[in-house]
Regions:
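Acidic/histidine-rich alpha-helical segments that form the ligand environment
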Residues: 54, 58, 75-128
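DHp/HisKA dimerization-phosphoacceptor four-helix bundle of two-component histidine kinases
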Residues: 11-14, 18, 44-51, 95-98, ...
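A structural signal for well-ordered alpha-helices, especially hydrophobic packing surfaces
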Residues: 13, 20, 27, 53, ...
Length: 145
């Protein structure tokens, strides 16, 4: 078990969990002319993220380590800025673009750590997650144009 990979995966798990929660808050609090489309899009995103964090946590367990748990521990590990509950729809989308971008950096770090030690299963999982978040960033940025 590589501690470097575990540390990177724990960061990815914490940030994925935080992003799921933030996206859920956006789903609850979005308002304005784009309400229906964003409300639906945010729901799709947080549901996908909750499935993803489970896969990431299970990968950590498969590597022989413990997945991060407890809201306090996850909050301490997560490197994402909080979103204001009363953010405008545009600000919500901008925030989620930035948060997905931060998570993309974490995913690429974890992918690279896995590649260095020949852990192709973890590398594949990180590549799949990178593809999801790149698409999400593209879609959110398209909304802002």
């Amino acid at each position: 078990m590589s501690e470097k990979i575990i540390t990177a995966l724990r960061q990815v798990a914490a940030d994925t969990y935080a992003l799921a929660g933030q996206t859920h808050i956006c789903h609850w609090n979005v308002r304005g002319p784009s309400f229906f489309s964003l409300h639906t899009a945010f729901e799709q995103q947080y549901n996908e993220l909750f499935v993803a964090v489970d896969e990431i946590a299970e990968r950590i367990r498969a590597k022989g380590a413990f997945a991060p748990g407890g809201l306090g521990n996850l909050a301490q590990l997560a490197g994402l800025e909080e979103i204001a509950e009363d953010a405008s729809a545009q600000d919500m989308v901008r925030h989620l673009v930035a948060a997905n971008g931060k998570l993309l950096n974490d995913l690429k770090t974890a992918r690279d750590c896995a590649g260095e030690v020949g852990d192709s299963e973890t590398e594949d999982l990180m590549i799949a997650r990178i593809q999801v978040h790149e698409k999400t960033v593209w879609m959110l940025n398209s909304f802002l144009e």
